[in-house]
UniProtKB/Swiss-Prot annotation:
Heterodimer of LeuC and LeuD. Its cofactor is [4Fe-4S] cluster. This is 3-isopropylmalate dehydratase large subunit. It comes from Synechocystis sp. (strain ATCC 27184 / PCC 6803 / Kazusa). It comes from the Bacteria. The gene is leuC. GO terms for biological process: L-leucine biosynthetic process. It holds the Pfam family Aconitase. The keyword Oxidoreductase does not apply. The keyword Iron-sulfur applies.
Length: 468
């Protein structure tokens, strides 16, 4: 047998059958659910008189609609309260593990599963959420799915899928100070495009990823979907194993040793054949900020907003639309642009190390006058850990609001929203029109440290200059 990639190995191990259509019926090892995409799926089960096939392989939490300030029940938003109640009823009826607000384990679904040790190498993972690719950081194959597919996994613990091609994305070298995992993935998406990964799984490889901690790797894999890929992964290694060891749902004792041995075996082989290979140099990546209305419209902080004639013809129409919506002029510097709101959080950048890096920037400074800045931990565990380290005090002393765990201003499904055409510096993953709650609200994606730099200067800034 020829040398294989991790993707091929995990896919083959989870193949139930090849269907007449050519699709694969793929077993799903872990199903994560939340309040937004699960109610309709449970209703479909009820209509057909079906039960959840493997409730022990399903884990639920509430994240999208959660208020990050007043969490008193019933929620002020009646639709949010309805979704919350539906999740409570459905998980109880089907004996599904549920992490509610105040449990100590609630949070964004893509934050809580890794921190509890639920996400492990070699798994297939599905969730009714675009950013399920996050879990690929562990060497898992993880897909975001739609509501009808949520129903299928609940009922049959499997999905009918077309097998993906595999593109190896190599990044080698050391990242300069002030350059983070978020900058790496924004750079990759900028270069390959938001449609560049369609039909692919992305394998991230090279010394730059090897040097990253697990939370940084999760940031990279999280935004694979923004680059058009269905999933993205990094081969498991000693960093992966060290992160998982001792976590609640990780194997223990002899089972741990056996698991690590197996996890090593599923990594892509050195001479594995890929459908495509793309290489980047870490030294070419600087703090990166989006200027437009797609995650692919990014530039280094030292660059101006691109002019129309500098872009590929295929990118010019969306660029023209972006100039108008974002109120930017071609050729203008992004650095120095005044910001209104600064948001640190999300499933991309709401983990402890993200908050630590932002706190280094904020410490000893004050949020600029007229800027609203707030920090939303990705989970109750992250919040507790951050408070134990005194990060909440650093942020609050600098004038940031310190909130409860949730998805918050990443999307407009809770009270945290932009007003009018406010400009947001955000550590989240999407900068689409209206994404943060206002039909004319504008979003600049950047690393948490860059958001902190924007908050204290009141404008888009180079974090390297703030850090000195």
């Amino acid at each position: 047998m020829s040398a294989r990639t991790l993707f091929d190995k995990v896919w083959d191990l989870h193949t139930i059958s090849v269907l007449p259509s050519g699709q694969t019926q793929l077993f799903i090892g872990l199903h994560l659910i939340h309040e937004v995409t699960s109610p309709q799926a449970f209703a479909m089960l009820k209509e057909r008189g079906l039960r959840v096939m493997y409730p022990e392989r399903t884990v639920a939490t509430v994240d999208h609609i959660v208020p990050t300030e007043n969490q008193q029940r019933p929620f002020q938003d009646s639709l949010a309260e309805e979704m919350m109640q539906a999740l409570e009823v459905n998980t109880k009826a089907h004996n599904i593990r549920f992490h509610p607000i105040g449990s100590g384990n609630q949070g964004i679904v893509h934050v809580i599963a890794p921190e509890q040790g639920l996400t492990q190498p070699g798994m297939t993972i599905a969730c009714g959420d675009s950013h399920t690719s996050t879990h690929g950081a562990f060497g898992a194959i993880a897909f975001g799915i739609g509501t009808s597919q949520v129903r299928d996994v609940l009922a049959a613990q499997s999905l009918s899928l077309n097998k993906l091609k595999v593109r190896k994305i190599e990044v080698n070298g050391d990242l300069a100070p002030g350059v983070y995992a978020k900058d790496v993935i924004l750079h990759i998406i900028r270069k390959l495009g938001v449609k560049g990964g369609v039909g692919y799984a992305y394998e991230y490889a090279g010394s730059t990823f090897v040097a990253m901690n697990m939370e940084e790797r999760m940031t990279v894999c999280n935004m694979s979907i923004e680059g058009g890929a269905r999933c993205g992964y990094i081969n498991p290694d000693e960093v992966t194993f060290a992160y998982l060891k001792g976590r609640e749902f990780a194997p223990q004792g002899e089972d741990w040793d056996k698991a690590v041995q197996w996890w090593r075996s599923i990594a892509s082989e050195p001479d594995a054949v890929y459908d495509d290979v793309v290489s980047f140099r870490a030294e070419d990546i600087e703090p990166t900020v989006t200027w437009g209305i797609t995650p692919g419209q990014g530039i280094g902080i030292s660059e101006p907003v691109p002019t129309l004639d500098s872009l590929n013809p295929d990118d010019q129409a969306i660029a023209s639309e972006a100039y108008k919506y974002m109120q930017f002029q071609p050729g203008q510097p992004l650095k120095g642009t005044k910001v209104d709101v600064c948001f640190i959080g999300s499933c991309t950048n709401g983990r402890l190390s993200d908050l630590e890096e932002a706190a280094k920037v904020a410490k000893g400074h004050q949020v600029a006058a007229g800027v609203k800045a707030f920090v939303v931990p990705g989970s109750e565990q992250v919040k507790q850990q951050a408070e134990a380290a005194g990060l909440d005090q650093i942020f609050q002393a600098a004038g940031f609001e310190w909130r409860e765990a949730g998805c918050s201003m990443c999307l407009a499904m809770n009270p945290d929203k932009l007003q009018g055409d406010q400009l947001s510096a955000s550590s989240s993953n999407r900068n689409f029109k209206g994404r943060q709650g206002s039909a004319s609200g504008r979003t600049l994606l950047m690393s948490p440290a860059m958001v902190a730099a924007a908050a204290i200067t009141g404008q888009v800034a180079d974090v390297r200059e703030v850090l000195g």
